[in-house]
Amino acid sequence: MAEIKNYTLNFGPQHPAAHGVLRLVLELDGEVIQRADPHIGLLHRATEKLAEHKTFIQALPYMDRLDYVSMMCNEHAYVMAIEKLLGIEAPLRAQYIRVMFDEITRVLNHLMSLGSHALDVGAMAVFLYAFREREDLMDCYEAVSGARMHAAYYRPGGVYRDLPDTMPQYGDSSKYRGEKEVRAMNDARSGSLLDFIEDFTNRFPSCVDEYETLLTDNRIWKQRLVGIGVVDPDRAKALGFTGPMLRGSGVAWDLRKTQPYEVYDLMDFDVPVGVNGDCYDRYLVRVAEMRESNRIIRQCVEWLRNNPGPVMIENHKIAPPSRTAMKSNMEELIHHFKLFSEGFHVPPGEAYAAVEHPKGEFGIYLVADGANKPYRLKIRAPGFAHLQSLDEMARGHMIADAVTIIGTQDIVFGEIDR
């Protein structure tokens, strides 16, 4: 009788569960994975090299396009690195706005992660539920920056503008939405952005309850996730896990608590931690994180309501002057012209800034040589370390479980391929 050999299967990059452009070369024994070899680089755009040929401000929008589901958190690490080198600090109000939008971004990311993970495993409803709330949060992005995704809202020294007093309204009824529905949507958008966010934080816990009703005790969901892709705490640390992947394995490491930046040390929140280190625990950690983010957003809204103030530093060598000042004062006009033609010069040195990104520790290592452009920009993407563990996590599991493991790793290729 002929010997049965292992066979090789190409999974992706066109596969709908491949989360973009992942190509996996799977070595299978029947339906059991013996080896998983991820091939990356299909979304490589030379971000680190491009940044060396742009001024510090011009390189900022590239950050949005790294992990294109957690846009503002990428920007945050970049502007923090520049601020370290310049030796400046954003005003307190700007810090609160940054923290609030970091947490809005975290919720956006986890909703996408949860919805697409459930869709990969075969639960379609959660995906549609999650995108209902994402729509509201995208409107917050649009209100402050004009863009729903690539906001470029954070700037060295603060944020681009203060929170607006009005929200964009939906137009007339269409074949997709009736008058009653449009009126209900616009009612929530009748006040300021802070009113809208506060209304969202009041509604959101019941939305998370809905997701949990659909998934947490669902027998099929538990059968697909419990005991799959188990990583013990020591191995998780050795593999370079951060974020929900590390906390799902039972290690309470969160940069917002261990190395607080901006105003996180003034916030009251808990760090959810898993027990078993399997896909189900990582799912529970992300759901709990959404609830904690909601608490932080609520605290920020309350503080921002009662404390008006500047959102950008006054140093016009770094931050552009106001439009009115620029049109009435020659010196301000010169500052404006210099900033937008040449940019500011950063003193020579190197800095590393890391934020607790929704996927883990997102770090920017920046080297400056005194010019108006970065000499070297190194991006530390959390998903890169997670993807390299895929082989270890998938071994001995079925092909169908590979989909679950990719979903639980929350892979986005913008940051992995850069």
From Swiss-Prot:
Q: Give the NCBIfam families listed for this entry.
A: NuoD, PRK06075.1
Provide the catalytic activity annotation: a quinone + NADH + 5 H(+)(in) = a quinol + NAD(+) + 4 H(+)(out)
Subcellular localization, as worded in the UniProt entry: Cell inner membrane
- Give the main localization category: membrane
The entry's function note states: NDH-1 shuttles electrons from NADH, via FMN and iron-sulfur (Fe-S) centers, to quinones in the respiratory chain. The immediate electron acceptor for the enzyme in this species is believed to be ubiquinone. Couples the redox reaction to proton translocation (for every two electrons transferred, four hydrogen ions are translocated across the cytoplasmic membrane), and thus conserves the redox energy in a proton gradient.
**Could you state one GO cellular component term attached to this entry?**
plasma membrane
Q: How does it sit in the membrane?
A: Peripheral membrane protein
Taxonomic lineage is: Bacteria, Pseudomonadati, Pseudomonadota, Betaproteobacteria, Burkholderiales
For the protein in the UniProt heading, the enzyme class is translocase
Q: How does it assemble?
A: NDH-1 is composed of 14 different subunits. Subunits NuoB, C, D, E, F, and G constitute the peripheral sector of the complex.
Record-given protein name: NADH-quinone oxidoreductase subunit D
An annotated Gene Ontology molecular function: NADH:ubiquinone reductase (non-electrogenic) activity
